[in-house]
Amino acid sequence: MKTFMAKKEEIKREWYVVDAKGKVLGRLASEIAKILRGKHKPIYTPHVDTGDFVIVVNAKDVVLTGKKEQQKIYFFHSGYPGGHRLISAKDMRAKSPEKMIYLAVKGMLPKGPLGRKMLKKLKVYAGPEHPHQAQKPKELNI
């Protein structure tokens, strides 16, 4: 029996919408990463982008467990000497709650060109509204 490898023409992409309200950040991000990679499909191939599009709404209402709201620190660096910035999860939620989910999912995807291509299929919105009604996204319960 020959190993199956998905071809670009065979891949059918779906759109899913996920409500992040009351969901734990890491658990939500791991499920989203699986869908973006395509691991939920029988045609999954590691070196081919077989994943689907994911729309995340209500990102501002995602839950962090324990004391992470005050203690978790996001680190950014510009590449210049002294160009580092530290921001707590509490400040990140106030400034851009979409980025919390984006960074959590980014860390769970492959590093490199394929991972960046998969990450482009993730759309995150702080509130309950999104501009992707034309794609007729399916509700996904995680």
UniProtKB/Swiss-Prot annotation:
GO biological process: negative regulation of translation; translation
Superkingdom, natural source: Bacteria
Record flagged with keyword Ribosomal protein: yes
Keyword field contains Transferase: no
Coiled-coil portions: none
Record-linked InterPro entries: Ribosomal_uL13 (IPR005822), Ribosomal_uL13_bac-type (IPR005823), Ribosomal_uL13_CS (IPR023563), Ribosomal_uL13_sf (IPR036899)
PROSITE patterns, alphabetized: RIBOSOMAL_L13
One Pfam family in the UniProt entry: Ribosomal_L13
Molecular function in Gene Ontology: mRNA binding; structural constituent of ribosome
Keywords: Ribonucleoprotein, Ribosomal protein
GO cellular component, one term: cytosolic large ribosomal subunit
Family: Belongs to the universal ribosomal protein uL13 family.
Subunit structure: Part of the 50S ribosomal subunit.
Protein's job: This protein is one of the early assembly proteins of the 50S ribosomal subunit, although it is not seen to bind rRNA by itself. It is important during the early stages of 50S assembly.
Official protein name in the record: Large ribosomal subunit protein uL13
Lineage of origin: Bacteria, Pseudomonadati, Dictyoglomota, Dictyoglomia, Dictyoglomales
